[in-house]
Design a protein with these regions (language model features):
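Alpha-helical transmembrane segments of multi-pass membrane proteins
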Residues: 30-41, 178-193
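Hydrophobic positions within alpha-helical transmembrane segments of bacterial inner-membrane proteins
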Residues: 130, 137-144, 173, 177-185
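Transmembrane alpha-helix/interfacial motif
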Residues: 14-57
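Predominantly long cytosolic amphipathic alpha-helical stalk/bundle segments
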Residues: 43-135, 146-158, 185-218
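Residue-level signature of catalytic and energy-coupling elements of molecular machines
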Residues: 15, 29, 62, 78, ...
Length: 218
């Protein structure tokens, strides 16, 4: 028998599945565009800072020019090292023992902090990429099940009876793939990009540590 309440429940579940998939797609694209812009800015800032750092300008002058809250990930790594460098000086100008180790640890912490900033949100892309196909599969099964229920109720296999349920099933499949495929592709790309950028920060920290080590030994 035809049950209007059952039909309403079916439509409610279908709508929730579709909303989840569409929302996941918009969420993933917002993260993708945000990260692409962030990575482009990070590369530009790193390039500009490298030019200033290797220009021959005294490090203390560069540090003062950057200020207490420098813009740019590499600049913040540099500032963290310089802050510890200045803290390690006694009033008579002599370096406190263990300065090199403290400077290295300070920059290591700064690199980790900048890496977390770059990589935040990427786990959401991974989650969407792995779960959206299964949510879409649930919608597919739900649509096919509704199509069979309609066949049983109408006692007919007419296309007009079967088509709505099949259309819902195909739409759920498509939306699941639409949400998952870009999320997976850009998760892999952005993860690789962030690894390369962070490797640049680590390389700079090592080079800067070497420079400070020479000054400590001189």
């Amino acid at each position: 028998l035809h049950d209007p309440l059952r039909r309403q429940r079916q439509m409610c579940i279908r709508d929730r599945v579709m909303i989840m998939l569409i929302g996941s797609s918009f969420w993933s694209w917002s993260i993708i565009f945000k990260k692409l812009l962030l990575f482009r800015t990070a590369r530009s800032e790193a390039s500009n800072f490298d030019q200033a750092f290797w220009s021959g300008e005294p490090l203390d002058e560069l540090f003062e020019k950057l200020g207490p809250e420098p813009n740019g990930h590499t600049a913040r790594v540099f500032s963290s090292g310089m802050v510890e460098w200045e803290r390690s000086h006694r009033s008579d100008g002599v370096m406190i023992a263990g300065a090199q180790a403290r400077i290295d640890r300070s920059m290591d912490v700064a690199v980790v902090r900048e890496a977390e900033d770059l990589q935040s949100g990427l786990t959401i892309l991974a989650t969407i990429g792995s779960t959206a196909p299964f949510i879409g599969l649930f919608g597919t099964v739900w649509g096919i099940m509704n199509a069979f229920i309609e066949i049983a109720e109408q006692q007919s296999t007419n296309l007009a009876v079967v088509a709505p349920g099949i259309a819902e099933a195909l739409l759920a499949t498509g939306l699941g793939l639409l949400a998952a495929i870009p999320a997976v592709i850009f998760y892999n790309k952005l993860s690789a990009d962030s690894d390369r950028i962070v490797a640049g920060y680590e390389s700079f920290a090592d080079e800067f540590s070497t420079i400070l080590s020479r000054q400590l030994d001189s």
